[in-house]
Amino acid sequence: MNHSMLRVPGVASLALALLFSAPLSAQETQLSDPEIASVAVAANQVDIDYARLAQNKSKNQDILEFARTMAKDHQGVIDQAVALVTKLNVTPKDNAVSQKLKADADKTRKSLNAKSGKAFDKAYIDNEVAYHQAVVSVVEGTLIPQSQNAELKALLQQVLPVLKTHLDHAVMVQGKIGG
C-alpha cells in the first residue's frame, strides 16, 4: 500500500484544503457563467504558474516534462476560454471561489519556492496530484452542473478528460520519483 498520501506535506495540504474548501464553496453558492469562467481561467493560470516554477527550479527530467505539458495544455484551455467568453461577449467575474483559489495558490507557490532539489520535486508533484484531484472534483461536481450556457458546458466537458489525464500523469511521475 502506498502510504505517501497519508503523510501529506505542507504544500499538498494546501492543495487538499482547496479540494475540500473550494468545491464546498462552489456547491453552496450558485455560480453564474461569468463566475464559472473566472474559476476556470484562475484554475488554469494557477497550474501554469506552478509549472513555470517547476521549470525554473527542477533538474528532474520527469518533472520538467510534466511541467512543460501542464504549461502548454493549461494555456490552451485559457485560450479556448478567452475565445469563448469573447464570442459570447461575457466578462469573467471574480468571485469567492476564484479568489480562494488564487490566495491558496499564492501560499503554495511560496512554500514550493522555499524548497530545492529532490524536496522541491516531491513537493511539486505531490501538489500537482492533489491539485488535479481538486480541479477534477470542482469541474465535474460543480462547474459542469452549474453551467447554463451550452458552449461553456461543452468546453468544460471537453477539458475534463484532459484534466484526468494530467492527474494520471502526475500520479505516474509521483511514483517514479518516490512520491
PLM regions with names:
Residues 2-12, 18-179:
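His/Met- and acidic-residue-enriched segments that coordinate or traffic transition-metal cofactors
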